[in-house]
């Protein structure tokens, strides 16, 4: 992908774009920050066959969900204040011990947290 492509993100000098319709919900506002080392962690989850979802933070302005090989990968928007970007929030995850492979989740943005509506 070339520099200047609409919607493309730069990572380590290369440009990437997620195809339209890939994410089930949420937004990708910056390139994710995966480790530079390959650890095969995700592949082990797929082999195990009993992982429903994995939740991640750190990427400051991303808040998406996507199912990859039967596992929901869920990125949560940043909650800290000593970083770039203006939007902050958190993710509520509701689990039912009787149905462990089903969950509900909702993003709470800082304006909703701080305006007395919650």
Where are these regions (language model features)?
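His/acidic metal-ligating clusters that form di-metal
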Residues: 1-59
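Binuclear metal-dependent phosphoesterase catalytic core
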Residues: 26-27, 32-48, 62-118
């Amino acid at each position: 992908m070339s520099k200047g492509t609409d919607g493309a993100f730069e990572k380590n000098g290369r440009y990437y774009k997620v195809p339209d319709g890939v994410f089930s919900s949420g937004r990708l506002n910056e390139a994710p920050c995966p480790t530079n080392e390959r650890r095969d962690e995700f592949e082990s989850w797929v082999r195990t066959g009993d992982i429903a979802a994995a939740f991640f933070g750190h990427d400051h302005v991303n808040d998406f969900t996507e199912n990859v090989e039967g596992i929901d990968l869920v990125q949560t928007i940043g909650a800290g204040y000593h970083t770039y970007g203006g939007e902050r929030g958190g993710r509520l995850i509701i689990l039912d011990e009787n149905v462990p492979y089903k969950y509900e989740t909702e993003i709470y943005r800082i304006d909703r947290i701080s305006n007395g509506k919650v």
